[in-house]
């Protein structure tokens, strides 16, 4: 029997899979996500995000996606390669950061058990 290699977890893949799990179409989700000027994002823009061709242009979009899709915003910020505002304001010294990062990596190897 052939081993199946799991697909890499990306921002776009997470958005698409969660949207489908919630039974939302791209059109329905796009209508709930608004740009800073209050207009909804386009279906094509959402499609580009889901297929990792584009990244969300603003923090507010990530926060809205997290809320509508019932996902943790910190997780989406991580997948998008961004740090939440409170983390950016309190950037630790290099030694503290290295210790925290090492602990995080160990927790991943342990399957999140700690």
Predicted regions span which residues?
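Short alpha-helical DNA-recognition segment
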Residues: 23-48
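Short, solvent-exposed amphipathic helices
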Residues: 64, 75-78
């Amino acid at each position: 029997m052939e081993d199946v290699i799991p697909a890499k977890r990306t921002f776009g893949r997470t958005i698409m899979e969660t949207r489908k799990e919630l039974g939302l179409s791209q059109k329905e989700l796009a209508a709930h996500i608004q740009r800073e000027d209050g207009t909804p994002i386009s279906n094509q823009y959402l499609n580009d995000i889901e297929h990792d061709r584009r990244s969300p242009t603003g923090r507010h979009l990530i926060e809205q996606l997290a809320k509508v899709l019932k996902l943790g915003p910190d997780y989406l910020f991580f997948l998008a390669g961004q740090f939440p505002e409170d983390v950016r304001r309190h950037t630790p010294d290099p030694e503290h950061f290295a210790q925290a990062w090492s602990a995080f990596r160990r927790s991943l190897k342990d399957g999140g058990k700690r």
